[in-house]
């Protein structure tokens, strides 16, 4: 099973955050910056990668993404 990444992108300090998962972090960040990533990132101008975690198994990355999305925002 291929590995995966959980990542967070933003548009600036105290800005909008996007949390995602991918098998190829470099290609995914490049796609977001070129406006080819998610519609949410394109709409909010999210081009800065601020956090990334690598996993040996994509299923572990997906589980981590789901857990992080349950975090409370403050």
What is the meaning of each model-derived region?
Residues 1-69, 74:
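GIY-YIG nuclease catalytic motif and its immediate N-terminal context
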């Amino acid at each position: 099973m291929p590995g995966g990444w959980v990542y967070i992108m933003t548009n600036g300090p105290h800005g909008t955050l996007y949390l995602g998962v991918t098998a190829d972090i470099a290609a995914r960040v490049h796609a977001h910056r070129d406006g080819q990533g998610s519609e949410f990132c394109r709409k909010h101008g999210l081009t800065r990668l601020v956090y990334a975690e690598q996993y040996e198994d994509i299923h572990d990355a997906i589980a981590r993404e789901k857990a992080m999305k349950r975090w409370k925002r403050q």
